[in-house]
């Protein structure tokens, strides 16, 4: 973290620098003009994590500044949503005088939504007892007069949910509202307003699609649920069980009837498609019945593994969302042999950092 770089007056210049850097990095692929989707310059992060410093009777949040090589007190945090900032102040005022709630507390995590819900996770270097549970329940009751809040306590091999361990986000995407269950300690898009722009872009580039869609690494169904409207059917894979469970909830709450989620890794699915292995999890699913002309991938920072990349290359159209331009560039060295980049986008999920979220649509040459 570099707090000095977080200056809204420099946001436009920083975004321009990112665009230029991205264009130069991918010039060899003869990409079309970069479509740039800006973030809000402040209060854009829907989640934040803070360490907690104890100093006598005082108690405060802090982060580590790599430039200063020191901890920095954070009574407020410019990137975090307005809701998180409001909760930060209200929560610390409650924690300071309460021995049971502050004793050996070392971290606080916040997960907020545009829909107004917020989840607070309190992390401890001690086991949590009945007194903690009682005090935490009273804390939740007091905070509930101002917030739609849930509280979780965590310690080594211990997790206490006072109510539920998730929030439900509502995103207005074009003329539709999509609802997403977001589970504590699971991946969610951190910048909700940019996430909306990503969904709208993905919907736009897949308009008038033929056949079915295959999605790898689908998470909680964020993209596949929004894209289902553009395809006859959608088949999606995800390995993490909490994400699969959330995806099933999201399919139901959004009334999506043409989306099937399979719990397996991209590598396993590649083997299944190549008929190298059979999987009990695929019983009742006829993979051969799907006519997937389009594949959607949103891989982890490491990019797509060689076997899966070969699978991906077999589709007419490839929609690739990347959180790491370096591994995207590596993957494009192979994909560019058979496909051409026809749409290219920069999504500024993480202002004031070097991080660049990118999207490319590739179509067979």
Curated annotation (Swiss-Prot):
Which interval of the chain is the signal sequence? none
Which PROSITE patterns does the entry link to?
Answer: SAM_MT_RNA_M5U, TRMA_1, TRMA_2
Q: Where is the active site?
A: 323 (nucleophile), 357 (proton acceptor)
| Claim: tRNA processing is one of the keywords in the record | yes
UniProt EC number? 2.1.1.-, 2.1.1.35
Cellular-component GO terms for this entry: cytosol
Top enzyme class: transferase
Segments spanning the bilayer are none
Listed under catalytic activity are: uridine(54) in tRNA + S-adenosyl-L-methionine = 5-methyluridine(54) in tRNA + S-adenosyl-L-homocysteine + H(+); uridine(341) in tmRNA + S-adenosyl-L-methionine = 5-methyluridine(341) in tmRNA + S-adenosyl-L-homocysteine + H(+)
Gene Ontology BP, a term: tRNA methylation
| SUPFAM superfamilies per record | S-adenosyl-L-methionine-dependent methyltransferases
- Record keywords: Methyltransferase, S-adenosyl-L-methionine, Transferase, tRNA processing
This entry's Gene Ontology molecular function terms read: rRNA binding; tRNA (uracil(54)-C5)-methyltransferase activity, S-adenosyl methionine-dependent; tRNA binding
Name the family. Answer: Belongs to the class I-like SAM-binding methyltransferase superfamily. RNA M5U methyltransferase family. TrmA subfamily.
Q: Which HAMAP family match?
A: RNA_methyltr_TrmA
Name of the protein in its database record: tRNA/tmRNA (uracil-C(5))-methyltransferase
The species this protein was found in:
Shewanella sp. (strain MR-7)
